[in-house]
Regions:
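N-terminal glycine-rich anion-binding loops that anchor highly charged ligand groups
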Residues: 1-17
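Flexible glycine-/small-residue-rich
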Residues: 7, 59-61, 69-73, 112-116, ...
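Translation machinery proteins
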Residues: 14-68
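Helix N-cap / loop-to-helix initiation motif
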Residues: 31-34, 76-79, 119
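RNA pseudouridine synthases
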Residues: 58-72, 79-105
Length: 218
């Protein structure tokens, strides 16, 4: 869907369409076959194809857990009905658009493999020059975070460096998180999973603190 929407929005040429470049990068990182990528591009070029709309729904789950559900849909009535139903089923409430935006910050996130022979000091300087806010270096991966307005600059810089980006996306990072006891947190995570299982849902963001105990249960 993301590739198709990007093509409909700004055309089928990745060179002049940063969003399409990002979508193709993510598809390749997820090992999507080349034929599937081409089909998605062609679907976006088809004027008669069903048109997808992007929409974000915001609301609260129990214990003050804020949730933003990003969707891509060809039927808004179906999608909002499903999202409202999930909120209700898990004891939450669907809010109005934009009501929770102050609780999250939009950041660009890039994940790439930590390749042998990479000179980390030089790489970090390149990233900082391109607008990196945070660089996390782990055993096998490097995660670079940037403010939303620097997303394009960072994408271009990584392309210039021929970096093998596995994930390139905009995320909603909570300004503060809420810590719950394990049982309450597990109920919240069941609700998050219900959102993620809906075919129209692309991403789900929340402000639940994912402690080690919670992660062990996932």
């Amino acid at each position: 869907k993301e590739i198709t929407i990007a093509v409909k929005e700004s055309g089928p040429d990745p060179e002049s369409n940063p969003r399409l470049r990002m979508a193709i990068t993510n598809a390749k990182g997820a090992s999507m076959p080349k034929d599937n990528i081409e089909r998605a591009i062609n679907k976006g070029k088809d004027k008669d194809a069903s048109s997808f709309t992007e929409v974000a729904y915001e609301g609260y789950l129990p214990n003050g857990i804020a949730v933003v559900v990003e969707c891509q849909t060809d039927n808004l009535q179906r999608t909002i009905s499903n999202i409202r139903s999930i909120f209700t089923r898990y004891g939450g409430t669907l809010g109005t658009s934009g009501s929770l935006s102050f609780l999250f910050e939009r950041n660009g996130v890039f994940v790439l493999p930590k390749k042998e022979g990479l000179i980390l000091d030089d790489f970090e300087l390149e990233m900082i020059d391109a607008g990196a806010e945070e660089i996390e270096i782990e055993e096998d991966t490097i995660t670079v975070s940037t403010m939303m307005e620097n997303f394009g600059n960072m994408q271009k810089k990584l392309e210039e460096l021929d970096a093998e980006v596995e994930i390139a996306e905009l995320q909603r990072v909570p300004n503060d998180t809420v810590t719950l006891d394990l049982e309450s947190a597990k109920k919240i995570m069941r609700a998050i999973e219900a959102f993620e299982d809906d075919d129209d849902v692309q991403k789900v963001f929340h402000n639940l603190e994912l402690t080690e105990d919670i992660m062990a249960e996932l």
